[in-house]
């Protein structure tokens, strides 16, 4: 059981979740795009949210700036979060268009706001769970897409909510976070997504 729960730490790693969100979006809205557009956007997301952050991690570790694999120390989170924020900004500014892919545009804008908020909290001496931030933002994005396209993803949403609990349990089991840090990470992930609903989702309902 412990191995099963701990697996969710890796399945829903913060670097992987934006790729899951992109895949989910194009599974729902693929008929509105050409295949080459889907491949191009997915490739850009994969490079900027997984490959480059992993490369930076190994660079910082080789330079002695990072010691642990899971960034338990608050100071170790500063550079990765700042770098990830820049990559998200590049992705938003050059890969998406608010007129062409508004749903993904606002999802990643929400992720950027959450990442900057997590960085601000670290600078203020507080730590939030990046895992909970990622999975909660994805869950809210799924709810938004369900409402926007009038498609009932009740089972998927229920599964994601259950996964939120399993991710939280895995982080507690690993003694990586306190309950307060998990709750803070969840709020940091949820609030920007809900706030941006007022821009792209609610006007269309």
Q: Where are the language model's segments positioned?
A:
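Short, hydrophobic transmembrane alpha-helix segments
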Residues: 27-40
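C-terminal halves and exits of single transmembrane alpha-helices
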Residues: 81-100, 122-124
């Amino acid at each position: 059981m412990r191995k099963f729960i701990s697996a969710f730490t890796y399945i829903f790693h913060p670097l992987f979740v934006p790729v899951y969100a992109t895949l989910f979006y194009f599974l729902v809205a693929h008929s509105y795009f050409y295949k080459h557009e889907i491949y191009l956007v997915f490739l850009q997301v994969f490079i900027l949210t997984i490959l480059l952050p992993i490369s930076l991690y190994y660079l910082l570790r080789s330079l002695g700036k990072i010691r642990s694999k899971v960034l338990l120390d608050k100071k170790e989170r500063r550079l990765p979060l700042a770098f990830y924020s820049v990559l998200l900004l590049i992705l938003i500014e050059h890969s998406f268009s608010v007129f062409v892919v508004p749903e993904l545009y606002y999802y990643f804008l929400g992720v950027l706001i959450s990442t900057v908020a997590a960085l601000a909290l670290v600078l203020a001496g507080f730590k939030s769970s990046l895992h909970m931030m990622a999975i909660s933002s994805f869950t809210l994005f799924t709810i938004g897409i369900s409402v926007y396209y009038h498609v009932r993803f009740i089972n998927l949403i229920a599964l994601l909510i259950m996964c939120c609990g399993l991710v939280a349990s895995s982080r507690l089991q690993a003694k990586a976070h306190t309950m307060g840090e998990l709750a803070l990470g969840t709020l940091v992930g949820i609030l920007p997504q809900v706030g941006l609903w007022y821009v792209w989702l609610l006007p269309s309902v």
